[in-house]
Amino acid sequence: VLEQALENRSVGTGLFVPPGDSILLVNRFGQRFVNEHRNYNDRSRSHATFDPNRVEFPNEFQFMVYDQRIVETVGEQNGQPPIKPAESYVISGKTLSDLAQNIAARVEALAPRLGGYELDKSFAQNLKDTVQRFNEYAVAGHDADFGRGELPYDNAWQQLWALPTYTETHPANPHPNLSLHPLAAGGPYYAIILA
């Protein structure tokens, strides 16, 4: 969690694998770039992906986007830093547009400590498009971009560390791929910056 690391260079634990099923990672362009449930040794390498055409590391800082379902079903029971909205490093928005705007404001506030890092101008629109595409994959049960849920590890993590507590409001995932669940049609939505 970037903001924990900025406050204390020695954090108790990192966010090894995004917990839950209605959760995704986007880069500075608002686009997915990895199977979020890959093991942390493989997924963490995505931070260092270099784009020689743009001469940048587009995934250096990653935005973990999730919905209220994740807050209520996984919450603090994930063996990692808490993802509840009360945490100072959690960014929230009533809509995806609000969330994108609030992420941009947070990045702008942190930019002096991030070497002038900024979001691409396409971030807000791409975030909406990315969530829509992710939701379509979740309903279909197949992640055509990154194959999330096709490997045993993709589902094993949440069964060990992010064991959800389902409720009447947020029942068990009824979709064919247990590692994918559509983000809610309405907010609130949340994000945490990962480094």
PLM feature spans:
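Mobile, glycine/GP-rich and aromatic-enriched active-site lid/loop segments adjacent to catalytic centers
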Residues: 1-195
